[in-house]
Structures are given as C-alpha cells and as structure tokens.
Amino acid sequence: MTTEETKFCEVKNNEIKEFAQGFKSPKGVLETAKNIYYWVRDNIQYENYSNTRKGAYKTLKEKSGNCCDQAHLLVALLRTAGIPTYYAHGTNHWWTVPCIDKQYHCDPTNRNHQFGNPNNNHGGNHNRFSLHNSLNH
C-alpha cells in the first residue's frame, strides 16, 4: 500500500505536512482520516474542468479543484498522516480509497457524500472502478 509522493500528490511539501498534522485524532487513525476527509469535502470548492490543473498544494492554497485535484489533495493529506491511500477511477470520475482496517471509498466533491459511502449523483460510477497509486494527468 502506498504512502509515497507522486507527481501531483506533494506528500513532502512542508505546508502540506504541517497542515496534515492538525487533523491527528487521539481516537486513532480512522478518526484522523475522517477529520481530513470532512475538511476537504467541506472547504474545497468543486470546479468543473478536465484532468489535473493544480495538484495537491495549489488545490489547498486556492481551496478549489475538480475531482482529480481534490483527490490529489485528499490523498496527499492522508498519506502525509501515514494512511496508505489509493486513487480510484470510475466512469469519468476520480476519488480516494484510504486503507485502514478496510478500504473506505471517499469522494469529497459533494457535501452529500459521507466518509466511506459516496453516492453517484455526480454522474460518475463508484461501483465499477480501478485503484491506482498515482494520477498523472
């Protein structure tokens, strides 16, 4: 499982590392992951464009991004917190899958989504997907 940095997932960025520290929970890794997920879901505005334009750091700074860039930010924060996390790709959509005691599908692009339980109201498909260590487009 992966916690490493990739092209748009800037795990080694000092600002991302410092920011991720603020989400650590004394209740454990699952609560830390939920804290990170809900912050991204509630604070990063969705923008509609194709592919990646920003990466994790710029998405954090601008507080906006499409599904790819929101996935980059969420993966970077989770990996920085030591949580192995994959990118998931379904029909025309990307989201994240942190692996703690099991795999949790986490899509921060809509405030109706819950940690580990995204719905399909954006037109993507969370039921048919593939997992990836990186997203490089």
Regions found by a protein language model. Give the residues of each.
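Secondary-structure boundary elements
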Residues: T2-G65
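Hydrophobic/aromatic-rich core segments of domains that either
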Residues: D69-N136
